Amino acid sequence: MAEALLIIDFQNDFTPPDGALAVPDGDRIAEPVNELAASPRFELVIATRDWHPPDHESFTERGGVWPEHCVRDTHGAELHPALDREERVDLVLDKGQDPATPGYSAFERPELGRLLRERGIDALTIAGLATDVCVRSTALDAIQEGYRVEIAGDATRGVDPAGSERALQEIRENGGRVAWAAASRTS
């Protein structure tokens, strides 16, 4: 079994204190994410970024539900500085570039599936932001693509606690697992 770690959207705009769409405690995932990324169990570590054009349909100014965030080539779209990118991230994959699609799932880009297949990856651990949006969408798409999926519960945070719990339950119901290192439990 070959396993990859996907770090979903650990970006400045999703983290307090100044993120345009800050996930509560989103900055607190840095340590568990870096610990995971340093683990020898992963054949590949990929970080994704929301990398929106300025006219993205998800922005409230254009009739969408989200404030403007992660606009490409801005400070907000950069990976969070606490992510040990140089030492631990093998590839950065941008998503959400089409202004007419939400871009929640890392699997919107066919390159991801192709790369994982080429490397013989059959299991994914997913960490990052936000549990109830992009982590959820990526996990469900990965399960549908046939990957074994584990969510690193300690290394994710969501926009809404109730929505995050619903997302984790949906992932479990579809065959994924949720692991909590701090509590030494898996569900």
Regions found by a protein language model. Name each.
Residues 36, 136-144:
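Histidine-anchored nucleotide/phosphate-binding helix
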Residues 122-134, 151-156:
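Glycine-rich anion-binding loop/nest that anchors nucleotide
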Residues 108, 138, 163-164:
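Residues at alpha-helix caps and immediate loop-helix transition turns in enzyme cores, especially N-
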Residues 78-129:
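Internal catalytic-core helix/loop-beta-alpha segment
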Residues 100-103, 156-160:
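Short, small-residue-enriched loops and turns at beta-alpha junctions
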Residues 80, 135-136:
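Short, well-ordered alpha-helical microsegments
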Residues 1-96, 148-150, 159-160, 165-187:
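Active-site acidic carboxylates
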